[in-house]
From Swiss-Prot:
InterPro entries: 4-PPantetheinyl_Trfase_dom (IPR008278), 4-PPantetheinyl_Trfase_dom_sf (IPR037143), ACPS (IPR002582), Ppantetheine-prot_Trfase_dom (IPR004568). The gene is acpS. It comes from the Bacteria. This is Holo-[acyl-carrier-protein] synthase. It is an enzyme of class 2 (transferase). It comes from Brucella canis (strain ATCC 23365 / NCTC 10854 / RM-666). The lineage of its organism: Bacteria, Pseudomonadati, Pseudomonadota, Alphaproteobacteria, Hyphomicrobiales. Pfam families: ACPS (PF01648). It catalyses: apo-[ACP] + CoA = holo-[ACP] + adenosine 3',5'-bisphosphate + H(+).
Length: 134
């Protein structure tokens, strides 16, 4: 059962300007260490950060809160499964909000797709409640 859907579209140039203007202050406030390591190693650094920013916005929308109600930027991080598929890892307020969405006897599956085509980056998040298998 789908319990949340979110999407976001962002201009990569906006993220690039913010990175130039605020540097590590912006990176440390918004992105996890894993996201920073991944993005800093990329040739298209601003596009990598923009996709991750869009993923966080989309995830916050799927949670039904936006960046509010105890959900902070660093509570949501883009990670990859062993096969390379992107997904979201939630902590803190985001993890608490996720638990509120889930019916009893279910676990969450967070589906994420991210893409970019300069000057835009886009993300879609679907949060699914799956029955717990005993």
């Amino acid at each position: 059962m789908i319990v949340g859907i979110g999407s976001d579209l962002i201009d990569i140039r906006r993220v690039e300007k913010t990175l130039e203007r605020h540097g590590s202050r912006f990176r440390d406030r918004v992105f996890t260490e894993i996201e920073q390591r991944k993005s800093e190693g990329r040739k298209q650094r601003a596009a990598s950060y923009a996709k991750r920013f869009a993923a966080k916005e989309a995830c916050a929308k799927a949670l039904g809160t936006g960046i509010a109600e105890g959900v902070f930027w660093r509570d949501m991080g883009v990670v990859n499964t062993p096969s390379g598929k992107p997904t979201m890892h939630l902590t803190g307020g985001a993890a608490k909000q996720l638990q509120k969405l889930l019916p009893a006897g279910t676990n969450a599956a967070i589906h994420l797709t991210i893409t970019d085509d300069f000057p835009l980056a886009q993300a879609f998040v679907i949060i699914e409640a799956l029955p717990v298998l005993e």
